[in-house]
Amino acid sequence: MPTINQLIRKPRKSQKEKTASPALQNCPQKRGICTRVMTVTPKKPNSALRKVARVRLSNGFEVTAYIPGIGHNLQEHSVVLIRGGRVKDLPGVRYHIIRGAKDTLGVNNRKQGRSKYGTKRPKA
């Protein structure tokens, strides 16, 4: 326990709050280029082949981002927009690719929750 004089000389440091998505650097989204598109398996007890991409961001960071929705058109050198948001069963995946922005197409035949998957409103 420090004395009052010690606290006057050297006050207590407040703890810095850690951000969940440091590569965004307090921006809502960042642009990046896919360096590798692959599938990874989730941790127990889930089982699947989740689609992810390794993305080199415009600020120099390289992150792994999840590709949401059924089917995608991404390949190496595709320009994508990423947002924060982790995938709970994929360790190390802390970002999502935004569907319908830049080179990423929206999800085909999507009727509900379209805004989250970059799908236009169906005709009639």
Curated annotation (Swiss-Prot):
Residues where 3-methylthioaspartic acid occurs? Answer: 89
Q: What InterPro entries does this protein's entry cite?
A: NA-bd_OB-fold, Ribosomal_uS12, Ribosomal_uS12_bac
Q: Which region ranges are annotated with the description Disordered?
A: 1-25
Give GO MF terms, alphabetically.
rRNA binding; structural constituent of ribosome; tRNA binding
Q: Say if the entry is tagged with keyword tRNA-binding.
A: yes
Name the GO terms of the biological process aspect: translation
User: What GO terms fall under cellular component here?
Assistant: small ribosomal subunit
Taxonomically, which superkingdom?
Bacteria
Give the residues annotated as coiled coil.
none
Keywords (A to Z) from UniProt: Methylation, Ribonucleoprotein, Ribosomal protein, RNA-binding, rRNA-binding, tRNA-binding
Recorded family membership: Belongs to the universal ribosomal protein uS12 family.
What quaternary arrangement does the UniProt entry report?
Part of the 30S ribosomal subunit. Contacts proteins S8 and S17. May interact with IF1 in the 30S initiation complex.
- Function, please? With S4 and S5 plays an important role in translational accuracy. Interacts with and stabilizes bases of the 16S rRNA that are involved in tRNA selection in the A site and with the mRNA backbone. Located at the interface of the 30S and 50S subunits, it traverses the body of the 30S subunit contacting proteins on the other side and probably holding the rRNA structure together. The combined cluster of proteins S8, S12 and S17 appears to hold together the shoulder and platform of the 30S subunit.
Q: What is this protein called?
A: Small ribosomal subunit protein uS12
This chain's source organism reads Borrelia duttonii (strain Ly)
Gene that encodes the chain: rpsL
